[in-house]
From Swiss-Prot:
One of its GO terms (molecular function) is phosphoribosylanthranilate isomerase activity. The keyword Amino-acid biosynthesis applies. Keywords: Amino-acid biosynthesis, Aromatic amino acid biosynthesis, Decarboxylase, Lyase, Tryptophan biosynthesis. It comes from the Bacteria. This is Indole-3-glycerol phosphate synthase. The keyword Lipoprotein does not apply. Pathway: Amino-acid biosynthesis; L-tryptophan biosynthesis; L-tryptophan from chorismate: step 4/5. Its EC number is 4.1.1.48. Signal peptide: none annotated. Belongs to the TrpC family.
């Protein structure tokens, strides 16, 4: 069983055990009307749009430094991030919906609920906690699930980042007419990353979609490797959580877009 399969099985058990219904009942509703649109930011931004992530750990990383997360959000906002991603998985990533709810009020930037969504109830909880965007991972969903969850999220006025790991999944994302597509550079079987995976997947990409490269981006040299793939932005977590000088580091990553 892969790590991803294990996580999905865990999410299924949480759904069956009433975890998400309890969250829906106990979390206060946070209004997201003041949140900016990430897609609008991409359209207006001549440089790469940055989704800056808040994370405490992952299945492959357990030594991330502890940060004042309110300050981290403020720094992301101040130094050029266009959106914030917040992990809400507790067991594998050390996040929570309570954390999302506490931090989303600290910024007007779009906030992405980064989780493993397989049921509309999870979308309801994400929105109630104050997310304005959600992640849908093509690899863990059937075509019907992907379409239904995508359409449901859009109906709730949420933006949707549809994540793909190979060209076949990219075609599946096109079928639901996903406007915002994340290309994950992580090998799902071995959980190792290669940023140039983005170049391979986007070699014959379609226009009228926006592409975000995710995972394995540690510095400006990594960004330069994939700049000519035609990406519109980056999702970066570990490198930002480790960085002690975001005022210099974050702007370095916001390179001018190269459109083919």
């Amino acid at each position: 069983m892969t790590i991803l399969s294990e996580i999905v099985k865990y999410k299924q058990s949480l759904l069956q055990n009433g975890y998400y219904q309890d969250k829906l009942n106990t979390l206060k509703s946070v209004k997201i009307q003041n949140k900016k649109s990430f897609i609008n930011a991409i359209e207006k931004e001549p440089k790469l749009a940055i989704i800056a992530e808040i994370k405490s750990k992952s299945p492959t990383v357990n030594d991330l430094p502890e940060r004042d997360l309110s300050q981290q959000i403020s720094d992301y906002d101040q130094y050029g991030a266009n959106a914030v991603s917040i992990l809400t998985d507790e067991k594998y990533f050390g996040g929570s919906f309570e954390r999302l709810q506490a931090l989303t009020t600290k910024t007007t930037l779009p906030v992405l609920c980064k989780d493993f969504i397989i049921d509309p109830l999870q979308i309801d909880v994400a929105k109630q906690a104050g997310a304005s965007m959600i992640l849908l991972i093509v690899n863990i969903l059937s075509d019907k699930q992907l379409k239904d969850l995508y359409n449901y999220a859009i109906s709730q006025n949420l933006e949707v980042l549809v994540e793909v790991h190979d060209r076949h999944e990219l075609e599946r994302a096109y079928k639901v007419n996903a406007k915002l597509i994340g290309v994950n550079n992580r090998d799902l079987k071995r959980f190792v990353t290669n940023v140039e995976h983005t170049n391979t997947i986007l070699e014959n990409k379609k226009t009228n979609h926006y592409y975000i490269s995710e995972s394995g981006i540690h510095d400006a040299s990594d960004v330069r490797k994939i700049l000519h793939s035609g990406i519109d932005g980056l999702l970066i977590g570990e490198a930002l959580m480790r960085c002690d000088n975001l005022s210099e580091f974050l702007p370095q990553l916001k390179m001018q877009k190269v459109k083919s």
